[in-house]
Amino acid sequence: ADRVTVSAPLHRASMTYDDRHHEHFEEHGYVRLGQLLSASELSALRERIDALMLGRIATEGITFQLDGEGDEYADLPPRALGSPKETLAYRRVDELHQDGLFLAYMQHPVCRQITRRYIGEDVSVFRSMFMNKPANSGTVLPWHQDVGVGWGLDRNPTTTVWTALDDATTATGCMQIVPGSHRLGVLNEGHYTLEEDQAFHCADDKVMDFEVEAGEAILIHNWLLHRSGVNGTDRPRRAFSVAYMPAATTNVSTGERFPVIFGKGALP
């Protein structure tokens, strides 16, 4: 199916990504970008993801994943093309660059400033992913770094923009991080953090609960150690995550490149 047409561009925030943001990002491995979405734009993205999950609009090329029977990551079923079950309880929805509304947000001017500083002119995305911890459920995501080699890439991207679609709190299973841990480098190319590294680097006194307001965006270094628990409330905890990388990045198994978001050949 064709990408969904957007009748009007998303709000263009006046925020400028400057040296202060860069210095915080370099030191801590993350930086808050503030509210990049207005209330109406936030509502529009929520409505769009609901429509996709409920099969109300075309989902060709978009993949969906439910939570497993338990709350452990190892219990997760594989991702599947299309929406095999009409439910708002999907854990994950991928390939959202194929939806016009989500693509417009991915191409936000602030994201362009960020990618130009850290990547360059020609930028692709490894994933454009909706993540959900449904009410009173969700899957425990173990400590890990987002390592490109573990994803089957020919390099390790470092630039992810994560946007809260709901308030993310300790009660709803917000992300937990170890500030500054990106400076350790890649601990395990297999993606997930080994138990001995967890014991050394993820002690309780080093961990920060990363609470975020709905509509707020965060720039996260891919090597920042992070995890999340389950949602113990009666409301969902939803987010949208985009991993940006150089357009020359390839899949080491197939040699294929990825959807271009900025620069030559970018999606319209």
Give, region by region, the residue ranges found by the protein language model:
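Short acidic-glycine-tyrosine-enriched beta hairpin
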Residues: 207-219
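Non-heme Fe(II)/2-oxoglutarate
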Residues: 55, 59-63, 188-192, 217-219, ...
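Non-heme Fe(II)-dependent double-stranded beta-helix
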Residues: 4-27, 34-143, 259-265
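Catalytic core of non-heme Fe(II) oxygenases with the double-stranded beta-helix
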Residues: 113-114, 137-209, 249-257
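Glycine-rich nucleotide phosphate-binding loop and flanking beta-alpha elements
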Residues: 39, 149, 226
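Active-site rim elements
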Residues: 99-104, 203-208, 228-229
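A structural signal for short, well-ordered beta-strand segments
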Residues: 127-130, 161-163, 240-244
